[in-house]
């Protein structure tokens, strides 16, 4: 089983978002519109746009588990994205930690970041890089900017 086999719906309710990206490199990011790190949306959009034709898909996962910074409904989250011209897909609102952790995050969180951290997602905007084969190949902390050279090198290694 790969990440592409894990069912998760889009924000609009359309099923099986990940399977529709099978064979592409994914950057999966838990997001929150009211987080101080929400400025990263612009960098994620730039990254998605720059590497879309190379096979990269940025997938945003709205989550309200960190400081209740994503309290909005699906419609409110969609309006937020539209107002900021965010074009990459969003999943349904999802738990990334705890008893109701989505199976996607059960698959992703064992992977260690550069500091050796595994397990629970620490905050909004933690990033997981998934290879075209559907395995996690990178994990980047919440404060790692989408334009960080290390993150960009890891993305380029997967899309080329």
Model-derived features with residue positions:
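Short, internal strand/loop/helix patches
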Residues: 75-124
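Thiol-/selenol-based redox modules, centered on thioredoxin-like
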Residues: 106, 110-160
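A short beta-strand-turn-helix
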Residues: 5-25, 46-51
